[in-house]
Every structure is written in structure tokens, then in C-alpha cells.
Regions:
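Residue-level detector of Asp-centered blade-edge/turn motifs that repeat once per structural unit
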Residues: 23-24, 82-83, 164, 216-217, ...
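Short loop/turn segments that connect beta-strands within beta-propeller blades
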Residues: 2-3, 41-44, 135-138, 187-190, ...
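Cap/lid segment of the alpha/beta-hydrolase catalytic domain
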Residues: 45, 52-64, 201, 347-478, ...
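A flexible loop/linker signature enriched in serine peptidases of the S9 family
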Residues: 12-15, 31-41, 51-75, 90-127, ...
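Signature of short aromatic-glycine-proline-rich micro-motifs recurring in repeat-based ectodomains
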Residues: 61-82, 156-161, 206-219, 305
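Non-catalytic accessory segments flanking enzyme active sites
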Residues: 88-92, 97-100, 123-129, 145-147, ...
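Hydrophobic beta-strand positions that form the internal "hydrophobic ladder"
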Residues: 25-28, 84-87, 167-170, 220-222, ...
Length: 611
């Protein structure tokens, strides 16, 4: 590597699934054909350390579809120890997992069929095993066994954290995901400690349990978890006992950095606004210090930070509500430097365009005692004495948040500024970052309160006096498409039209990890599965204009979901509009995205915008 020459195809296979450098020196590991290879340096001969990899059957070092999407949120399943002495890797066994199959049409005479192991609710899930390789002697491998309390049934491996070169911490979850077991493992057998965490009211964590951050003693650790009042806070865990070190009716979002003297974390404590994010420093017994609350106060209320190795510097990333701003901060003094201030974009927005204004506030709805947050985007030169069409932009999934302080330029911005449509979003029951009581309200009953609350919010919006009650629509993507469809199928009479992009139709059709986290298995919760289907509401769509959009190659929310909605609507003699995007996945990228928004504009102009 000192010669700065590119590696040849002989040295690294041309289609490598993953390549991860060791933290020190020039060692690397890569995955090819679902097997792991080690190299002592970039030009050294590769040593194959697994030999059983097989597509859609046995995967070494990379996750399968459901682990990548729902467990790791990453395509990596290799973890180097701090000094590169050991390499831990995940082995996934998908042998018993049923495949989803769909066609890729391409340009050939015959379509290609894609097969992906995809465990649906109630079905066989992948089997996960964790191994550790001695890099100096790759044939020496040991398995990190799942604890008996978890391993007696189906389970998931959630996180792998190297504490030292000789100590490993692993989090395991039972299939139900209402508890987590953190196991600390030492290779010499002197330490084998377990710490358990169980949710009192629902699933554990927001989407999944947070990772541990180890203290200087390499045994105790810091972790974000729910306190006794159901708010996510920092805890110090020592000898299996968790002690809260922050508290209040707000939440710690995540830990950014742990040093010998300080813990840096992001929370939404400031000003009691759950949609804000600020960076804090907690040192010893002193009160937490907010490092970003007073910086660019009007512009920057949604921040994150990335630290240097010893935390002497950090990059402050400000995402709104003003234009994004990226700044290099000196953690030891006042010095800082602007990395990107978006001045050019600011000039365009202030001199060439009329931008909407955004209001964020709270209101009460029937069925819940706490004030809930909404945001509303108003057209330029808004006049409260006039009536405007309203479009609800919804996601609504568990632990989600639509009312935040992030700057966005998106389709909604165009509709508001150009077509004079008010855009509103509402965080009802099931939404996150405001405590477990609100978030877990939909536990075991998706398709209920998060749907009802959107309808209640619209009634409140109408009472504000400037909404044209005859021109109200809703749209959403993925879970938002599901909520849109459930709302339109409720027969409320409030909505003229709705757009559902890549919606779920039935939770039986979606993946087991996500669905069972909130709904358990179908055989354990039959009525809730039955009552949460879009298809059973098909007859109520006769009174609304409905547009259904889906990609035929969606490997996440399968085209099967839209096909079932379409079939139910046809069987009930409901007229609706549909748009299928050939060979496009869940994101509808490329030219399909432009086509989609043009089509959505046309749909709204036909059904919502005209008086």
C-alpha cells in the first residue's frame, strides 16, 4: 500500500460483498461468495477461513435480508477486536426460511425470478451463530454460545461490542423482543456476566435495544434504556444493576462518545420540544452541559456530532430548522471553523423563491390526556381569513416522529409554495421520543390508535377556520401508505382523496422481526391481525378517490401487498387509480421518482386542488 498502487482483481475478487480493514496495521477481512477471507496486508495471499457459505442458505460475515433491514441496519456482520487480534463474525442459516419470489422483467425474452429468504410473521426465522477467529491462527475458531435463557427458543443476535482484545459483549433477544440479555464473555473463562433488561409495557428499546458503551474499567457500561417512568435515559450498569444518571420527561436519543471523564449524548430535553436534538456533556457528578443549545439558536435546533478519537474535536452537524450548517468545534476552547454553510442555497431561497412557513405546536385529541405535537406548513402570504386545501403527510409507524426541526426541500415544499396547499403532520399514539406510554399505546394493535388519531387531528385542523373541509387529502409511503389506506377505509367522511405508496395490506405478509416486535405472532394475536387489514375495508373506498403506487421489485413491502389491495377493491367494485413501477424497489429511485411526483401532482390537481 505504500506504493499507492491499486489492488488487482487477483488480490481482491471483483465482486466482493464486504471488505473491512482492521483498526490497526494493514490487516483486512473480506466476504466473497458468502465466505470470509483474511489478508495480513493488502498484497498478502488471502486465507479462506469459512467454507460453508452458500447463497440463500449459509451466510458468513454478511447479514441476510431481514438482519440487514431490521436488526443491524447495516450490511456488515464482521467485527474486529481493538488491536486486530481477533475477528468476530455472524453466521446466518437461512435453510429453513421461506423464499419470497418476484420477477425482474429487464429486457430479455424471459423475465428473471428473484429468490430471497424472507421470514414473514409467524414463520421460520434465520438461525444466528457468532464465531471468533484468532487472526494469527485462522483455523482456531470458537463459538460464542447463546445464553440458555435465550437459546431455548427462537432468538436474534442484536449487537456485538469488543471491549478489549480478550473481552466481548453480545446482546441477544428472544423472538418476542420484549427483553434483551447482554452477555460479557472473556476467553480465559474467568468472567461470564449477564445483564438482562425487560420492557414493562411493550417491546424493548425504540426499534431495538441500544448498544452498550463501556467505561474505563472495561466491565461496567453506559446504555440508553427506559427508566421506571418509561422515558429513555442514560444508565450506568455495574455488576448487573442499572443506575439512571439522567432523568425527566424527555429522552436521551443516543450516546455519541464515552471518554475517561465524560459521556457525550444527544437528547430532546431543551425547551421541552421532543422534535429537537442537542448535544450534551455529562462529567462526573456535575449537571449535564448542553454544547449546542446556544449555538446558532434560530438556525440549529436539530443537531448531531461526530467526535475525534480522543474527543478533542467534534463536527457539529446542524440539520435545521434553518439551512443545514456543518461546523468543526474545538472541545477544549471556543475555536471553530465552518465547513459548509450553504450560502449559495440561502441566496437562491431568499432572492428567487417564496418559501412556506412552518408552525410547530401541540393539541389535545379525544382518547389521550397528553398534548400531542403537530406541524403545519403554510403557503407564502398565508391569509387566515381564506380557505385552503389540506394534505396530511403521514408515516405513523411505531417510534416514528414527523414533527421535528429538520430543514427539508421536498415535494411537500413545492405543493405548499406553488399550489397553495397546507401540509400538516401529526404525531399521535405510537410515535416515539416522548415516553413509552405514548409509544407503546399501539402495542399488539397496529392499525388502531395511530389511524384514529390522524382522523381526530384533521377534525382539530378544520376547527382552526382556514381549512376547506371539502378539499382534504392524505398521503404516505410504506407505513405511511398503510395508515393512509386505513384512514381512507375508515369511512370517516373527512377525506376526498388519498395516495398510498408501497403500503402494507396485511401484517401477515410483512417480515417477522418488525411485525412480531409490535404484534406478536399471528397465532398469539389473531383478532388484531384480522382487524388491521386494509383489504377488509375495501368497500369504504367507494366514497374517496384512491391512488395506489408500488414497485414490482420491492423486496421490503412486496408487490403482493398492493396486489391484494387491488384485488379487494376490484371485488368490491371500487374505482381507483394505480401506478406500478416495473423492476423498481421500495425506494422508487431514478426516473421513476420524477415520474411518481408528476403523477401525484396530476392526481391532486384532479381531486383535491380544484374548488
Amino acid at each position: 500500500m505504500e506504493s499507492r498502487e491499486f489492488l488487482s482483481k487477483v488480490q481482491i475478487p471483483p465482486v466482493t460483498q464486504l471488505l473491512v480493514w482492521a483498526p490497526v496495521e494493514n490487516k483486512l477481512a473480506y466476504v466473497w461468495n458468502y465466505n470470509i477471507y483474511l489478508k495480513k496486508n493488502a498484497t498478502a495471499e488471502a486465507v479462506q477461513v469459512t467454507h460453508n457459505g452458500k447463497v440463500n442458505k449459509i451466510l458468513n460475515g454478511v447479514p441476510d435480508w431481514v438482519y440487514e433491514e431490521e436488526v443491524f441496519a447495516s450490511n456488515e456482520a464482521i467485527w474486529w477486536s481493538p488491536q486486530g487480534k481477533y475477528l468476530a463474525y455472524l453466521q446466518i442459516n437461512d435453510t429453513g426460511v421461506h423464499n419470497i419470489e418476484y420477477s425482474l422483467y429487464g429486457n430479455d425474452q424471459y423475465p428473471t425470478t428473484v429468490f430471497i429468504p424472507y421470514p414473514k410473521a409467524g414463520c421460520v426465522i434465520p438461525r444466528a451463530r457468532l464465531f471468533v477467529i484468532d487472526v494469527e491462527n485462522p483455523s482456531r475458531q470458537s463459538e460464542v454460545l447463546v445464553p440458555k435463557s435465550v437459546g431455548v427458543g427462537d432468538h436474534y443476535l442484536r449487537t456485538v461490542t469488543w471491549v478489549t482484545d480478550e473481552r466481548l459483549a453480545v446482546q441477544w433477544l428472544p423472538r418476542r423482543q420484549d427483553s434483551v440479555l447482554l452477555q460479557i464473555y472473556d476467553y480465559d473463562g474467568t468472567n461470564w456476566k449477564e445483564t438482562s433488561q425487560k420492557s414493562k409495557t411493550g417491546w424493548v428499546g425504540r426499534y431495538f435495544p441500544a448498544a452498550p458503551y463501556f467505561a474505563a474499567n472495561n466491565m461496567s457500561f453506559y446504555k440508553v434504556m427506559s427508566n421506571d417512568n418509561g422515558y429513555k435515559h442514560l444508565h450506568y450498569v455495574e455488576a448487573g444493576k442499572a443506575k439512571p444518571i439522567t432523568s425527566g420527561k424527555w429522552e436521551v436519543i443516543y450516546i455519541s462518545k464515552v471518554t475517561k471523564d465524560s459521556i457525550y449524548y444527544v437528547s430532546n430535553e431543551h425547551m421541552g420540544r421532543p422534535g429537537q436534538r442537542n448535544l450534551y456533556n455529562k462529567s462526573g457528578h456535575s449537571a449535564p452541559e448542553c454544547l449546542t443549545c446556544s449555538l446558532y439558536q434560530d438556525r440549529c435546533q436539530y443537531n448531531s456530532a461526530y467526535f475525534s478519537l480522543n474527543a478533542s474535536f467534534f463536527r457539529m452537524d446542524c440539520y435545521g430548522p434553518g439551512l443545514p450548517l456543518f461546523t468543526l468545534m474545538d472541545n477544549r476552547g471556543p475555536a471553530k471553523g465552518v465547513l459548509e454553510d450553504n450560502k449559495k442555497l440561502e441566496k437562491i431561497l431568499t432572492t428567487e423563491l417564496l418559501m412556506p412557513t412552518i408552525k410547530r405546536a401541540t393539541m389535545k385529541i379525544a382518547g389521550f390526556s397528553t398534548y400531542l405535537w403537530y406541524q403545519m406548513m403554510f403557503p407564502p402570504n398565508f391569509d387566515s381569513s381564506k380557505k385552503y386545501p389540506l394534505l396530511i403527510q403521514v408515516y405513523g409507524g411505531p417510534a416514528s416522529q414527523n414533527t421535528d426541526y429538520v430543514f427539508r426541500l421536498e415535494w411537500a415544499t413545492y405543493l405548499c409554495s406553488t399550489e397553495k396547499v397546507i401540509i400538516a403532520s401529526f404525531d399521535g399514539r405510537g410515535s416515539g421520543f416522548q415516553g413509552d406510554e405514548l409509544m407503546h399505546a399501539i402495542y399488539g394493535r397496529l392499525g388502531t390508535y395511530e389511524v384514529e388519531d390522524q382522523i381526530s387531528a384533521v377534525r382539530k385542523f378544520i376547527e382552526m377556520g382556514f381549512i376547506d373541509k371539502d378539499r382534504i387529502g392524505m398521503w404516505g409511503w410504506s407505513y405511511g401508505g398503510y395508515v393512509t389506506s386505513m384512514v381512507l377505509g375508515s369511512g370517516s367522511g373527512l377525506f376526498k382523496c388519498g395516495i398510498a405508496v408501497a403500503p402494507v395490506a396485511k401484517w401477515d405478509y410483512y417480515d417477522a422481526v418488525y411485525t412480531e416486535r409490535y404484534m406478536h405472532r399471528p397465532e398469539e394475536n389473531t383478532e388484531s391481525y384480522k382487524n388491521s387489514t386494509v383489504t377488509d375495508r375495501a368497500k369504504n373506498f367507494k366514497s374517496v378517490q384512491y391512488m395506489l403506487v408500488h414497485g414490482t421489485a420491492d423486496d421490503n413491502v412486496h408487490f403482493q401487498q398492493a396486489a391484494q389491495i387491488s384485488k379487494a377493491l376490484v371485488e368490491n367494485q371500487v374505482d381507483f387509480e394505480a401506478m406500478w413501477y416495473t423492476d423498481k424497489d421500495h425506494g422508487l429511485s431514478g426516473k421513476a421518482r420524477y415520474h411518481l411526483y408528476a403523477h401525484l401532482n396530476h392526481f391532486l390537481q384532479n381531486y383535491t386542488l380544484p374548488k
